[in-house]
């Protein structure tokens, strides 16, 4: 994907706010469905970004990662949950946590399908190679290629961002959502100590990921980037295959 210009970054910011809102609203919605009305009573079952944004996690963190040359991720204001309202406390807590990253994976699919629709309707112009001796060769835009306009760029950025948010939040370390799966599997006598690690905060995770870059003594960042690259590449192959089938000839 080629460098992003000013308009591209504006679109990226809007997509980021939308994605974080969907992520946090998914937590709140599932918690409410499982019997905990806390988030709903506080107005968190909504896609309104103003209800979910956090000054550090939603703004300063993504900017800091960008200037540090690291993958851009972010977060919203944590959704308040009272596990005492759940019938199956550990299991339901895990399901609420997984709702966030799975909502981002759903958005990955949405952006991929929007790319197909944009290609099919001509919003993303195909590359036409003129052939003076026969029919012109029409090549439709590739999800894995360079963007020809801002619509294409925004759709690719949306898919990449949400894939990154999903994978990052599934890292099984507190306070990320993936740690709730580990907590569910742990004996009840250890669960409290495991969840107490949440107090160390997201910046410990970022520190571990930064130290995990190649040549810095670890592999956490390397594995994250490889998973992100693998996921985006295979998404691109699937989207391009669908475009090739449904796009008009």
What is the role of each PLM region?
Residues 1-249:
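Hydrophobic transmembrane alpha-helices and their immediate loop junctions
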């Amino acid at each position: 994907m080629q460098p992003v210009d000013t308009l591209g970054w504006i679109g990226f910011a809007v997509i980021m706010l939308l994605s974080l809102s969907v992520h946090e609203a998914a937590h709140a919605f599932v918690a409410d469905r499982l019997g905990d009305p806390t988030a709903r009573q506080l107005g968190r079952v909504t896609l309104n970004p103003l209800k979910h944004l956090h000054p550090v996690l939603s703004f300063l963190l993504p900017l800091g990662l960008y200037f540090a040359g690291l993958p851009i991720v972010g977060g919203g204001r944590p959704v308040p949950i009272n596990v005492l309202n759940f019938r199956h406390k550990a299991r339901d807590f895990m399901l609420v946590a997984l709702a966030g990253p799975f909502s981002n994976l759903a958005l990955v699919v949405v952006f991929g399908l929007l790319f197909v629709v944009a290609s099919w309707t001509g919003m993303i112009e195909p590359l036409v190679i003129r052939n003076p001796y026969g029919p012109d060769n029409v090549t439709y835009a590739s999800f894995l290629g360079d963007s020809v306009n801002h619509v294409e760029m925004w759709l690719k950025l949306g898919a990449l961002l949400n894939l990154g948010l999903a994978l990052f939040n599934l890292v099984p370390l507190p306070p990320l959502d993936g740690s709730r799966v580990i907590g569910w599997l742990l004996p009840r006598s250890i669960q409290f100590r495991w969840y107490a690690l949440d107090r160390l905060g997201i910046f410990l995770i970022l520190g571990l990921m930064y130290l995990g870059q190649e040549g810095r003594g670890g592999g956490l960042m390397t594995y994250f980037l490889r998973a992100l690259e693998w996921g985006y590449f295979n998404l691109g192959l699937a989207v391009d295959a669908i475009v090739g089938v449904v796009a008009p000839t």
